[in-house]
Amino acid sequence: MNIKTVTIIGANGTMGCNISGIFASFGNAKVYMVCRNMESAEKAQIKATMSVKAEAIGKNLIPKTYDDLEECIGASDLVFESVREDIDIKKSVYEKIAKYIQPHTVIGTGTSGLSINDLSEYFDENIRQHFMGIHMFNPPYNMTLCEVTPSDYTNTDYLNEVKMYLKSVLHRNVVEVKDEPAFMGNRIGFQFINEALQYAELYKDNGGIDYIDSIIGPFTGRSMAPLVTSDFVGLDVHKAIVDNIYKNTNDYAHETFVMPEFAIELIAANKLGRKTGAGLYQTILNTDGSKSINVYDIVTKTYRAKEKYVFPFVKQMIKELKVGNYASAFNKLNNNHSTEATICIQFLIKYVIYGIVTTKSIGENIHSADDVMATGFNWVPPLAVIDAFGGLEAFRQIAIEKSSKEFLSFIDMNEILKDLPKSKYDYRSFFKAK
């Protein structure tokens, strides 16, 4: 597939802007950056150039407005829609662009969870066969995952050509997933994040948000703690993802997608996270120019200084991780019977199980969950967690011994863990000594 010209609709948004940079740099494509007004488009052009750290691509990025749709789409090999996650807004955009789409043009949507089948039905049948989900992760320059989702109408040849282009030209780690709510990466990732948020409420008298983040932080195989991640993404986006999953699925983890009331109250107060300056955490600029971090106290409903919790198992794990004694680090966790260590190991077990269940349900193969979590979230992949605990049999024994009776009643542990391969990923690169 030879894609020389691309139109990005909604190019002023974070993802639309960053993806413009990917097409212009890796793809060396002419990219029409369509925004509602020229001022927004010109600002987006500058940001896109900065996002890939390559000023030379500026010549490939062309600011445009909706008044230029006929010119842009008529000349494009691929049209990428990246407007807000609102089905009515997307429908309105599709109505505007449909009349200009050429017979050869690929149409992609960057939706992070809306149904590809539902969206495709806003187009005529001859256009639907070229329509698919192309979901990249932010920032795409660093996170190479691209979830590709066909609809029931997508032409297989077009699908395969687009996947090859994404792999070979844009250097994406492409995972084809079924048209299920939140697809795969966000389904697995936000199950973990939202349950961590529920645990923050459950353990609010112990400290709540920063207490839980201290228990399942970077030393457990993720680039940042889960509730820091929620703040980074935005509580409003977090809520949209989990609400969609809760409404449209009914697996054993269904109730873990209910957002706690305190977080809904923060959203109502426009305390959405990093983008508004306060959410679960709050950044304070001190008079000397330095920054300090406060955290939302669920009990008092005010912000307080972030605590520096000292849990023996965490200190021991980090000490072992620093010198590369991974087996010893996980033995320290497994042999510690404190409340905090139990929470930590149970979260890791549940993450593995949900990842495997999800990849069997909606992935291409058993390694799909590993691919999406490693390259979309920079989290240790589920199968790699099993390797870190000493292999399948060792993990099975630990999982049965450490899981709650309630959790074990929901699942068939032995069946889920049956005949699993080793991960393609080296777990050692994900566990941070901090």
Regions found by a protein language model. Give the residues of each.
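N-terminal glycine-rich phosphate-binding loop for ADP-containing cofactors
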Residues: 1-434
